Amino acid sequence: MATLEQEIKRNIARGDKKVNGFTGAVRSLENLGLEKGDEFTIPERFDVYEQKIGDNAVRYIMVELKNGNAKPFYPSTFTKSRPVYNQDGTPTGQRVFTKGTAAELFRQYGSVQEGMDALRGKTVKVSDIEQVDTLRYGTTSLMKAQIPTIDLV
């Protein structure tokens, strides 16, 4: 892994850009990059970056993990939700969503910016990651989705 400064340089080199805050809809991402046990503090002052994914753009902040490594953190992680499917591709009727005290706090607010503002300076920890069978977007093929539990520390 890389330091915060190295990771920011890498992301900008691949085309990401710094933007003014969070706007638009929350988009769920499959590859969160989070692992069980990751712990980090949402900075009091953070820069927001925008990453193009196909025709869409997603916004994130960079966080430094307790172990010194850096990762992008997408606020959409707090609202991640997926329907659960059986191995034969039929729906179970269940839906799994991000759990935890940090996710609950974020979801109390009406916008991404307000939710992130409420988390400024707070330390969070990925206390669990649940693997669920779901369908790949726009297809009938099964995939494993990772749904985290993110708690305030």
Give the positions of each predicted feature.
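Short beta-rich binding modules
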Residues: 1-153
